[in-house]
Amino acid sequence: MELYLDTSDVAAVKKLARIFPLAGVTTNPSIVAAGKKPLDVLLPELHDALGGKGQLFAQVMATSAEAMVEDARKLRAIINDLVVKVPVTAEGLAAIKILKAEGIPTLGTAVYGAAQGMLSALAGAEYVAPYVNRLDAQGGDGIQTVVELQQLLTLHAPQAKVLAASFKTPRQALNCLLAGCEAITLPLDVAQQFISAPAVDAAVAKFEQDWQSAFGRTSI
C-alpha cells in the first residue's frame, strides 16, 4: 500500500514525513498555483523534504497530445523519476500511449468514471486517480466508482494501480483501501484527521495522572 500527501506545502511534508510512512507527494495545477512556487523550485524542495526517497507526481498543462508529451519531458528534466499526471481526455489517452512508449511513467488523472479509468490503464498509465469526493459532490458514488475501477483493473490491467484522490474524510480513504486500492493520496486536513484522536489523548493523560499519583513522577 502506498500513502501519499496531496499538497505543495513543503514544511508540512517535512513535518508529516517524520510521522507517516509516506511513499511520496502528489500535486496538481491548482495545488501548485495556491502555493505560488513554480515547479522548477517546488519539486526539488518536495524531493528534499522527503529525504530524497519519495515518489513525486506533477501534471501537464497542455491540452493536445503532442504538447502534453513535451510538458512531460520538461517535468522529467526537473525530477528524473517523476510520475507525470495526464488528464484522461481523448488527447490525454493519446499522450499516455506515447509516453508509455518513451518509458515515462504516467498517472491518469481527473477520472470520474470506471470505464474512463480503465482506458487510461490500458493505454499504459501506471496509476489511475479517481476523484472520490468530487464524484459524490456531483451526485455520483465515489466509492462505488472506485470499487468498479479496482475490479476492472484487477481483471484487465493488473499492472496499473488505483491511486484514489479527492477525500474529505478518513472514512472515504479507508473505504477505498477496503475496496482493494493499492494507493491513496490525502490532503493535509484529512491526513491530520487520521492522527487527531481526542479519546487517545485523554487515555494518555489518564495514564500519566495515575502514574504520577502512584510514583510522584511521569517517567519510568
Swiss-Prot record:
It comes from the Bacteria. It is found in: Cytoplasm. GO terms for cellular component: cytoplasm. InterPro entries: Aldolase_TIM, F6P_aldolase, TAL/FSA, Transaldolase_3B/F6P_aldolase, Transaldolase_AS, TSA/FSA_arc/bac. Gene3D superfamilies: Aldolase class I. The active site is at K85. It catalyses: beta-D-fructose 6-phosphate = dihydroxyacetone + D-glyceraldehyde 3-phosphate. Its EC number is 4.1.2.-. Pfam families: TAL_FSA (PF00923). The keyword Lyase applies. GO terms for biological process: fructose metabolic process. The keyword Coiled coil does not apply. Keywords: Carbohydrate metabolism, Cytoplasm, Lyase, Schiff base. One of its GO terms (molecular function) is fructose 6-phosphate aldolase activity. HAMAP family: F6P_aldolase. Homodecamer. Belongs to the transaldolase family. Type 3A subfamily. Catalyzes the reversible formation of fructose 6-phosphate from dihydroxyacetone and D-glyceraldehyde 3-phosphate via an aldolization reaction. This is Fructose-6-phosphate aldolase. It comes from Enterobacter sp. (strain 638).
